[in-house]
């Protein structure tokens, strides 16, 4: 899991670095959709190493945005729901209803919390910092299931085996949303 997370961070970092290595090389707007783990990395919930990598990504974006804002960061409604569930589990841990498992982010969130209101404060701080310090907001689109999105929908491509794996389903759903935003066309 740790190696996969590092790999994902490196892919994001390399992709941005390649596209904006030369100032002005980004000719069109680029919106990057971040998942829960990357958002936790930015905030520091997954430790200093991941936070440094995530902040390097923001430095690259800031450099690319020096002339005009081309790079934006967003997260999907489903990602927000995943984060909200994570914080709800943290509340259950603070209440003593669930045991704390070996999860770096969960430990960071629950550390020092005496009651549920402490978790609520941390959740509010998390979303506030994402928006006002980093400009990361939830995607504004109301739905990804309009009739006009049918051709770009990749969710129907699940194999029977993949339909059983919730993580694969979630990943394909997010990729499908991005494909719909791009109208089934590559970025480059």
Describe the predicted segments one by one:
Residues 1-187:
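Active-site-proximal, substrate-binding regions of enzyme catalytic domains
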